[in-house]
Regions:
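Core RecA-like ATPase module of SF1/SF2 helicases and allied nucleic-acid translocases
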Residues: 1-220
């Protein structure tokens, strides 16, 4: 599924988003990963923009897919399909190369430069060394606020039940437009849902949670 995400509670651990992102990137069949500093990227990787200090129109939480990667000694160029319309003029003002507009997406090329100790004290030059996006096969539930996907898979290990407040759970299960799958044990489900029932505030959100869980159970 192209528009799909795994939502995680933590960054680290077996079920953390770092490990899950690595798993899905390794499963990406588009050749070897390109290594840049501490980063690894492949063509076809799902990404989320997370730094808009350099680019006005590549805003925080903008979704994209890497189409091409061109690496040189002093720079790396990414061709990316971003899920928003950016005009050619807007790209020019952001110093991004406009390539095409395809199905409500814009194909762009941006360049990240190698770290240069002689220039990094200059704020504008320092911004050009930052990769402004992260891998996004898996995303933290907190980061997913405001995002929507056709398919959402939520991973809830039994060791993290104390972190699942009603608000966190509500955020996770309402990110989907079509399909929701929750990976948890029956004991974990019971502990979490019974905890929600003891909370007296947020009746509307509790009803939405119950309805979502009924739909998920019915479709599984």
């Amino acid at each position: 599924v192209k528009d799909e995400v795994v939502l995680c509670l933590n960054y680290d651990g077996k079920f953390g988003l770092n490990n899950i992102n690595s798993y899905f990137q390794n499963a990406n069949p588009n050749g070897e990963a390109i290594i840049w500093q501490s980063w690894r990227f492949k063509k076809g990787d799902k990404i989320l923009f997370n730094d808009n200090s350099r680019f006005t129109y590549l805003y925080n939480n903008l979704k994209g897919i890497i189409v091409e990667i061109e690496k040189a000694d002093d720079q790396i160029a990414f061709t990316i399909d971003v899920e928003t319309i950016i005009t050619e003029q807007q790209c020019k003002s952001d110093q991004i190369e406009y390539i095409d507009t395809i199905d409500e997406k814009t194909r762009i090329k941006l360049i990240v430069y190698a770290f240069d100790e002689d220039e990094v004290d200059d704020e504008e030059n320092a911004k050009k060394t930052i990769i402004p996006f992260q891998l996004a096969y898996a995303v933290s539930i907190h980061k997913a606020q405001g995002l929507e996907y056709d398919s959402v898979k939520v991973v809830i290990p039994s060791v993290n039940t104390e972190k699942i407040t009603k608000g966190v759970f509500y955020t996770a299960i309402t990110r989907t437009k079509k399909k929701l799958t929750i990976y948890w044990s029956s004991e974990t489900m019971e502990a979490i849902i019974s905890g929600f029932s003891s909370e007296h505030n947020g009746f509307k959100s509790l009803e939405i949670i119950k309805n979502k869980l009924v739909q998920t159970t019915s479709s599984s």
